[in-house]
Amino acid sequence: MYRIFRFFSLLFIKLFFPYKIVNKKAAKIKGPYVVVCNHLSNTDCFMVGSCFFEKAYYLCKKEWFKHKILAWFFSSCGAIPVDREGADVQALKTCLKTLKNGKKLIIFPEGTRNKTGARLLHIKGGAGVLAAKTGVNVVPMYIKEKSRIFRRNYLYVGEPIDISEYFGKRVDRAAEEALAEKIREGILSTGDKLEEYLENKKAKRR
């Protein structure tokens, strides 16, 4: 069922919101890991998810699950409902179980779509905590801009962020903030690499 959804959703997205994945090989790490990416559009989860042939899971605000048909659709696509207003223990347990079962988990650590024009909003600490608790890699990605119909967009896959110093240790508030900062730097660095790629691409055309 997932592969059917994947095929038709990607067909729709690529037809109306074309995009190119740069450095896709960096996403081909075996085993579970957490993907962190900036968040600009409702199509972001499909763009990021298309980096993987196997099913990847991602957090999705619980409001999308109010209607049975939508809840069924998003659940089939790997969505995990989360309450953004407070600490959602059930979502946390589901995420931990997902990673422990060897799956990939996509998180947009800004917590909402960025409509400010800034490169990133404040980064929440959940992604780093999940990765540290399960001892998995964190792979940063960066989307160039908000998706617009028939306008090509770009997604850059960065190299893993090293958080191994936190594996097997208690993650207190200070560690959570340090992990969030590492993730912030990793996403921004990946964005810089995307800009460099696009500049080089322009230079070759001249």
Regions found by a protein language model. Give the residues of each.
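Glycine-rich, highly charged phosphate/nucleotide-binding loops
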Residues: 20, 87-91
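Membrane-anchoring hydrophobic helices of lipid-metabolizing enzymes
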Residues: 1-34, 43-44, 52, 76-79, ...
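Non-catalytic C-terminal accessory region of glycerolipid acyltransferases
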Residues: 92-206
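Soluble or luminal CAZymes and related metallo-dependent hydrolases
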Residues: 4, 87, 175, 179
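Short, flexible active-site-adjacent loop segments at beta-strand->alpha-helix junctions, enriched
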Residues: 25, 39-40, 52, 62, ...
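Structural signal for conserved beta-strand scaffold positions within catalytic alpha/beta enzyme cores
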Residues: 23, 58-60, 81, 140, ...
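Catalytic core of membrane glycerolipid acyltransferases/transacylases, capturing the structured
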Residues: 27-86, 94
